[in-house]
Regions:
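A structural signal for multi-pass alpha-helical bundles of membrane permease subunits
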Residues: 4, 14-300
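Membrane-interfacial, low-structure loops and terminal tails that flank and connect transmembrane helices
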Residues: 2-8
Length: 300
């Protein structure tokens, strides 16, 4: 017998079966992700005095030039960045610490994890309505509890200096349970023998956390950070219901401004320009986080 040829190995036949299985996912991505992004990019190079497509005219990068001279847009983008930082500092860090504490609780950890995940199941609109009542300076229980312990209540959603933090607390309350579950899943893949070896070497609890847990949870941390960045940058519904960007636009984010320009004013091209810039910022931040983690992995 002669040596097998590339045709004998099946390389000459086109196997369509894998493409059939991934076709639904590709169609979904094409229709709901890539087409809207491409459409927004195209719209951003046009403008219309009436908002109708038949009145579109080419402006090139005119919308982008106007956008970066728009102080309100830049202020909204700044609020988005602050929101990202708060979302990393509060729910992500809290979720990681709770996951580590629950890791050694045996069967009860699933019960606690389920309890922590309950806020994640509450719709953002419902959460915003409930927390508006909690924050209410007249009838809300938060100020009432503060007064009981001798502290002064505050108009949480009417104070420009704290409103963004107050609204972010609502989002953090809803989101931290998701972080707990992801980190708990990652902790299941860490062998207990590594902790035993660290104890033998004299490592304390903090040393085990920083030199065993954190490095081995790197993939889970990257996923949560990227997911948090994407979710925080396009946040909209909770702020829309809780404050509608007020007071005095102190809690306005880019998503809310896109809604105002498109749905209220009919400036779809300008809103599309904002969407394009927001997409670029999200991709840039995500790439920075991923590259930083990958670089650290290569150095290790």
């Amino acid at each position: 017998m002669g040596e097998p040829t590339w045709k004998d190995a099946g390389m000459g036949r086109f196997n369509v079966r894998p493409y059939i299985f991934i076709a639904p996912a590709l169609i979904y991505l094409g229709v709901w992700i890539f087409y809207p992004i491409l459409n927004a990019l195209v719209l951003s190079f046009f403008d219309s005095p009436t908002g109708r497509s038949r009145d579109y005219f080419w402006v090139g990068i005119g919308n982008y030039a106007k956008l970066f001279q728009d102080d309100l847009f830049l202020k909204s983008l700044y609020h988005n960045i602050i929101w990202v930082l708060l979302s990393i500092a509060l729910p992500v860090v809290l979720g990681l610490l709770l996951a580590v504490l629950l890791a050694g609780r045996g069967r009860t950890r699933l019960m606690y994890a389920s309890i922590y995940f309950i806020p994640q199941t509450v719709a953002a609109v419902c959460a915003a309505i409930v927390w508006r009542w909690i924050y209410d300076p007249s009838i809300g229980p938060l100020n009432w509890l503060l007064e009981i312990i001798g502290l002064t209540g505050r108009p949480w959603l009417a104070d420009e200096s704290i409103v963004l933090i107050a609204v972010n607390m609502i989002g953090s309350w809803s989101y931290y349970g998701f972080c707990v579950l992801i980190f708990m899943a990652g902790l299941q893949n860490i062998s207990p023998e590594l902790y035993d070896a660290a104890k033998i070497d004299g490592a304390g609890a903090l040393q085990q956390f920083f030199y065993v847990t954190i490095p081995l949870l790197r993939n889970a941390i990257v996923f949560v950070l990227v997911y948090t960045i994407i979710g925080s940058m396009k946040f909209f519904d909770l702020i829309f219901v809780a404050t509608n960007g007020g007071p005095n636009e102190a809690s306005t984010v880019v998503g809310l401004r896109i809604y105002w320009h498109s749905m209220r004013e009919g400036r779809f091209n300008y809103a599309a320009t904002m969407s394009t810039i927001l997409t670029v910022v999200i991709l840039a931040l995500s790439v920075v986080v991923i590259r930083q983690i990958v670089t650290e992995d290569e150095e290790d």
